Amino acid sequence: WDAEPGALYTLVMTDPDVPSRKNPVFREWHHWLIINISGQNVSSGTVLSDYIGSGPPKGTGLHRYVFLVYKQPGSITDTQHGGNRRNFKVMDFANKHHLGNPVAGNFFQAKHED
C-alpha cells in the first residue's frame, strides 16, 4: 500500500467462509491482526493475533482469505482484539477504532487438497 510518512496502519487477514461458504456460521475467522504499523514496515507493528496460514478443512470447498489495511487516526492503545478468532467482525473492529474504510486490500482463494 502507499503509506503516508509518519502514519500508522492496521493489517487484518480474515476468512469469511468458516466453516464453509455455504454455512458461514463462524464468519469471520481472523488469521492475523497487527496494529500500529509504521508506514509499510509490518514488523514494526503490535501483533494482536499471530499469523495462521490458510488451511480449509476437507469438504468445505473454496475459502476466501481477505487482507485489509486501514490507516489509523492515531496510535491504538487498546490491545484487545475481541476474544476468539471465530466470529470476528472486521467492521466492528474498524468502527471501534475509528479506522474508516480500508486503504488497501487483496484476497486469495484456497481449498483442501485431497
Swiss-Prot record:
A Pfam family (short name) is PBP
PROSITE patterns, alphabetically? PBP (PS01220)
Output the Gene3D superfamilies linked to this UniProt entry: PEBP-like (3.90.280.10)
Coiled coil spans = none
Protein name (record): Protein D2
The gene designation is D2
Please report which protein family the annotation says this sequence is part of: Belongs to the phosphatidylethanolamine-binding protein family.
Provide the taxonomic classification. Eukaryota, Metazoa, Ecdysozoa, Nematoda, Chromadorea
